[in-house]
């Protein structure tokens, strides 16, 4: 018993082809003709492909041998077959405006025309609109009353000021902003200037140091006649290949240590003058201070002082006695008393210092004249230290 099956005629109107379902390659999927539907327009499609041409291999946008000459699945149009044609666009019409270039910006209308609501802050309608909590939240900071009632506004100026505090002042105070930036910029510029000057101190002192070895002549590096000859140069600027380079580095290292020691001495003198150093003067009748195991004061210092006190004596009962730090020259007095206790010959200098301090004005004028006469040479010696004077002055004022 054999089975037979026939294709219903309703599957397609073009019954002359062997593919009644209309998927490929003889039926179009172009929506313009509603392919694979019951629309009888398919039979009237002049661009439908023929089965005999479907066996031909064509070249399209997808490579050789992949796109048949008929439209295939994408349709029969040239764009669907990958053959895109660029048509020249029509030139734009000639402008009737004879003026070229950017036209001027029109004048902005006044505020009363563009934003009439902004001119009605004093009106009754504006105050009535503020009764709405949603409108009130736009003009007053968060956290205010949201019950729908508006607190009585004393003046219109306060209302406008509160609105500006919410949305920002349209004309900020640029003077305060400028002064806030100008101060740090000036400090930064002054600090950079002092830094550049301070960096020249080692080289200046190095030049002065080496000039002591070449009295009456120009300083010349002695390493140029050694095993590694170099061109004539100053001993303060030796290249790394010069044998004098290591001596130049050693001299500048000593100079840096000397400058640091000088700054430390000045800082200690300044702190000692202001009474901020925990230095105790010697107790009368004792040669040294006793600060060994004594850590805390059981007997407070006499009087009140804003500066810290120190434990200077240790009586036999084991209690420490706190002595307040002197208000001025504590460090200098401590060093002098410490040196006098160990070097007795320093006490012989006291009368000379007292005599020098009691000289007549005539002697002081003579000293000033001598300094004026020898001033240029002293200036050449002390000029490298001039950049340190502003730093010492700032420390003296602000500490």
Curated annotation (Swiss-Prot):
This protein's major location comes to virion
Q: Which residues are the lipid attachment points (N-myristoyl glycine)?
A: 2
Q: Which residues cross the membrane?
A: 181-201, 253-273, 348-368, 375-397
Composition bias (Polar residues) maps to 95-105
Q: How is it modified after translation?
A: Isoform M is N-terminally acetylated by host at a ratio of 90%, and N-glycosylated by host at the pre-S2 region.
Q: Mind listing the UniProt keywords for this protein, alphabetically?
A: Acetylation, Caveolin-mediated endocytosis of virus by host, Fusion of virus membrane with host endosomal membrane, Fusion of virus membrane with host membrane, Glycoprotein, Host-virus interaction, Lipoprotein, Membrane, Myristate, Transmembrane, Transmembrane helix, Viral attachment to host cell, Viral envelope protein, Viral penetration into host cytoplasm, Virion, Virus endocytosis by host, Virus entry into host cell
Gene Ontology, cellular component aspect: membrane; viral envelope; virion membrane
Q: Which GO terms describe its biological process?
A: caveolin-mediated endocytosis of virus by host cell; fusion of virus membrane with host endosome membrane; virion attachment to host cell
Query: Where does this polypeptide localize?
Result: Virion membrane
Taken from the record's topology, the Intravirion segments are 2-252, 202-252, 369-374
Topological domain, Virion surface: which ranges?
A: 2-180, 274-347, 398-399
Q: What biotechnological purpose does this protein serve?
A: Systematic vaccination of individuals at risk of exposure to the virus has been the main method of controlling the morbidity and mortality associated with hepatitis B. The first hepatitis B vaccine was manufactured by the purification and inactivation of HBsAg obtained from the plasma of chronic hepatitis B virus carriers. The vaccine is now produced by recombinant DNA techniques and expression of the S isoform in yeast cells. The pre-S region do not seem to induce strong enough antigenic response.
Q: Which InterPro entries match?
A: HBV_HBSAG
Region of interest called Pre-S, as start-end residue ranges on this chain? 2-173
- Family indicated by similarity: Belongs to the orthohepadnavirus major surface antigen family.
Return the domain comment text from this UniProt entry: The large envelope protein is synthesized with the pre-S region at the cytosolic side of the endoplasmic reticulum and, hence will be within the virion after budding. Therefore the pre-S region is not N-glycosylated. Later a post-translational translocation of N-terminal pre-S and TM1 domains occur in about 50% of proteins at the virion surface. These molecules change their topology by an unknown mechanism, resulting in exposure of pre-S region at virion surface.
Q: This protein is called what?
A: Large envelope protein
The record's gene field reads S
């Amino acid at each position: 018993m054999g089975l037979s099956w026939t294709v219903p005629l309703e599957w397609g109107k073009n019954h002359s082809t062997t593919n009644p379902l209309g998927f490929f390659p003889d039926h179009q999927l172009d929506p313009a003709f509603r392919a694979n539907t019951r629309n009888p327009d398919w039979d009237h499609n002049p661009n439908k492909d023929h089965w005999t041409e479907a066996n031909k291999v064509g070249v399209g946008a997808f490579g050789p041998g992949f796109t048949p000459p008929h439209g295939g699945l994408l349709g029969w149009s040239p764009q669907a077959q990958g053959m895109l044609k660029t048509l020249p666009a029509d030139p734009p019409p000639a402008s009737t405006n004879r003026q070229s270039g950017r036209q001027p910006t029109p004048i902005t209308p006044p505020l009363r025309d563009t934003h009439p609501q902004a001119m009605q802050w004093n009106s009754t309608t504006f105050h009535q609109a503020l009764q709405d909590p949603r409108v009130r939240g736009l003009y007053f900071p968060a956290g205010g009353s949201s019950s729908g009632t508006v607190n009585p506004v004393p003046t219109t100026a306060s209302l406008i000021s509160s609105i500006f505090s919410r949305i920002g002042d349209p004309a900020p105070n640029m003077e305060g902003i400028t002064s806030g930036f100008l101060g740090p910029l000036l400090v930064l510029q002054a600090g950079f200037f002092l830094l550049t000057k301070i960096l020249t101190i080692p080289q200046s002192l190095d030049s002065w140091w080496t000039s002591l070895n070449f009295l009456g002549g120009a300083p010349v590096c002695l390493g140029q006649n050694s095993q590694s000859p170099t061109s004539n140069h100053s001993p303060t600027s030796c290249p790394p290949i010069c044998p004098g380079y290591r001596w130049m580095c050693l001299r500048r290292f000593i100079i840096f240590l000397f400058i640091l020691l000088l700054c430390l001495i000045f800082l200690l003198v300044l702190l000692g003058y202001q009474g901020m150093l925990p230095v105790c003067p010697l107790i009368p009748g004792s040669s040294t201070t006793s600060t060994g195991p004594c850590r805390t004061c059981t007997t407070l210092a006499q009087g009140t002082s804003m500066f810290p006190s120190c434990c200077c004596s240790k009586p036999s009962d084991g209690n420490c006695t706190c002595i307040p730090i002197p208000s001025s020259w504590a460090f200098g007095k401590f060093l002098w008393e410490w040196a006098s206790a160990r070097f007795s010959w320093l006490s012989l200098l006291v009368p000379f210092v007292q005599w020098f301090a009691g000289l007549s004005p005539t002697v002081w004028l003579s000293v000033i004249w001598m300094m004026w006469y020898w001033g240029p040479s002293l200036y050449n010696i002390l000029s490298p230290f001039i950049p340190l004077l502003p730093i010492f002055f700032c420390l003296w004022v602000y500490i």
